[in-house]
UniProtKB/Swiss-Prot annotation:
Its cofactor is Zn(2+). Zn(2+) binds at C275, C277, C280. Belongs to the archaeosine tRNA-ribosyltransferase family. Keywords: Glycosyltransferase, Metal-binding, Transferase, tRNA processing, Zinc. Substrate binds at D120. GO terms for biological process: tRNA wobble guanine modification. It catalyses: guanosine(15) in tRNA + 7-cyano-7-deazaguanine = 7-cyano-7-carbaguanosine(15) in tRNA + guanine. One of its GO terms (molecular function) is zinc ion binding. It comes from Sulfolobus acidocaldarius (strain ATCC 33909 / DSM 639 / JCM 8929 / NBRC 15157 / NCIMB 11770). Binds 1 zinc ion per subunit. InterPro entries: ArchSynthase1/Queuine_TRR, TGT-like_sf, TgtA, tRNA_ribo_trans-like. The active site is at D85. This is tRNA-guanine(15) transglycosylase.
């Protein structure tokens, strides 16, 4: 059925899903390149050649400059997935447009896109909360106003309910809850983040995405308007964003800005292209610089599209392998703004753990690096698991080991005692589960970060204080904890050493 969304794979709060549309199945995460119906610097055929199977265009501009009231697929000579925006971006840019919500929604029903957006009122980055509240209420009102058109076209079009609120997280929460309750709309979208992304202000964007996603149904696909920089895709996907749209690829190209997955260069800065796409394999930066302006813009735009496509594919592969946390950890160090985004997303580690699958198909290694790895779902989940394990003996044996071989050779230590392995990042791991996932599959540096050691000592203190052991033995922990081995000692002796 049109609008059905099936989740195929999950990692953190991200997912690979299949959205059913009239013109085929859309696999998410997915990017919708913005097509300008008036300018043809990049053709739809160019976009298809890069590998995209979904585009977005502006119904307001179609109405204003083309005016045809017929199937937009025919107008554009395009038979794949098509989304229409309504003119809200023009409101954000120019303050108002000469068309009503009812007019544009009615026009969209005649264009018959696969996915369509009502004419909402963007909040933008206004500092006037009254204005922000007005934009939220107006958007909610317009969604209700459009319901009769939505109902009549629901078998052909997936309608999107925008979420507004700008920088006011309480308004975003309210807007998200109301949007989610309106069952006429099968897709949701966060509006107004474009300016933040243009400024590389990713940390507040993380807050906005979290606040909206944590207050809507998991089963509805979620769109991020204006999400066009490879910098931010992985962080947004980790929080549960499914689709993006942007004209960034062409806007950057007009300014001779060359995207990579880590940063943006100006063409004149480059002696070599750090890319092997068909454009960069054929030309050098000098070649492109010497081309006529129109050709130069076209080639940079095509390259930018290849980079966006590559990033989306890399995110999907990381998600499929259960390595999305490691990937955003890696992305964090590509730019100070992504580092801020990563630090901000760690504030929501419990939310990420909530949706992260406990077990995936093929077991992969768990790579642990520094104190940021303490926020991984596997590590957070261990604390809950440990709290459920009951004390069975009066004696406790703690063992530190750098080896994945059997860490306890001396079975005498194990008699009549509860036995735990002291494992950096996790804390105390029951011996009988040490050889299971994720503990045995965890890979970590031979020299452990001092913040991780500090955390490990605190976890050990907490573990000891929550139980009533009479004696404790600690073995082989000189290197990790800087504590000499002791056997059968009072618990307070170890606590004093920690």
């Amino acid at each position: 059925m049109i609008g059905d969304f099936e989740i195929k794979d999950e990692d953190l709060a991200g997912r690979i899903g299949i959205l059913e549309t009239k013109h085929g199945k859309l696999e998410t995460p997915a990017f919708f390149p913005v097509i300008n119906p008036v300018k043809n610097e990049i053709t739809i055929q160019d976009i298809l050649s890069v590998g995209f199977e979904s585009i977005i265009t502006n119904a307001f501009l179609i109405k204003k400059y083309i005016g045809k009231e017929e199937d937009l697929h025919s107008i554009l000579n395009y038979n794949k997935i098509l989304m229409t925006d309504s003119g809200a971006y023009q409101i954000l840019q120019y303050g108002d447009i000469d068309v009503s919500n009812v007019d544009i929604v009615n026009y969209e029903t005649k264009l018959k896109p696969d996915i369509a957006v009502i004419l909402d009122i963007p909040t933008g980055l206004t500092e006037d909360k009254k204005e922000a509240e007005k934009s939220v209420e107006s958007t909610i009102s317009r969604a209700k106003e459009a319901s009769k058109f939505v109902e009549l076209s629901k078998d052909e079009i997936i309608w999107v309910h925008p979420i507004q609120g700008g920088m006011y997280l309480d308004l975003i929460e309210y807007s998200a809850r109301i949007a989610d309750m309106n069952q006429d709309y099968k897709m949701l979208a966060l509006g107004s983040p474009t300016v933040l992304m243009q400024r590389y202000e990713y940390a507040p964007l993380i807050d906005m995405i979290y606040k909206s996603k944590s207050n809507v149904s998991r089963g509805k696909p979620f769109h991020l308007f204006g999400g066009g920089h490879p910098h931010i895709f992985a962080f947004a996907v980790a929080l549960g964003v499914d689709t993006f749209d942007s004209a960034s690829y062409i806007l950057y190209a007009r300014d001779h800005r060359y995207m990579t997955r880590e940063r943006v260069y100006r063409l004149e800065e480059l002696d070599y292209f750090p890319c092997s796409c068909p454009i960069c394999s054929r030309y050098s930066p000098k070649d492109v610089m010497e081309m006529p302006e129109e050709q130069k813009v076209r080639l940079i735009a095509l390259h930018n599209l290849y980079v966006i496509k590559e990033e989306i594919n890399y995110i999907k592969q990381s998600l499929k392998e259960g390595r999305l946390f490691e990937y955003i950890q890696q992305k964090a160090y590509s730019h100070p703004s992504t580092f801020e985004a990563f630090r901000r997303i760690l504030n929501y580690s419990k939310y990420l753990e909530k949706y992260d699958p406990r077990v995936k198909g093929e077991v992969k290694g768990v790579f642990l690096f520094d104190n940021s790895s303490l926020h991984r779902p596997e590590v957070i989940r261990h604390a809950y698991t440990l709290s459920k394990i009951k004390q069975r003996s009066k004696a406790l044996v703690l063992y530190c080991s750098d080896s994945k071989d059997n860490p306890l050779k001396n079975t005498e230590d194990m008699k009549n005692a509860d036995v735990y392995i002291v494992l950096p990042f996790y804390g105390c791991v029951p011996y009988n589960v040490f050889f299971t996932y994720p503990y045995f599959q965890s890979e970590m540096p031979s020299t452990i970060d001092k913040d991780v050691i500090y955390d490990l000592k605190n976890k050990l203190k907490e573990f000891l204080s929550q139980r009533s052991y009479e004696t404790v033995s600690i073995i082989g922990c000189e290197k990790i904890l800087h504590v000499d081995s002791i056997r059968g000692a009072p618990v307070n002796l170890l606590l004093n050493k920690l």
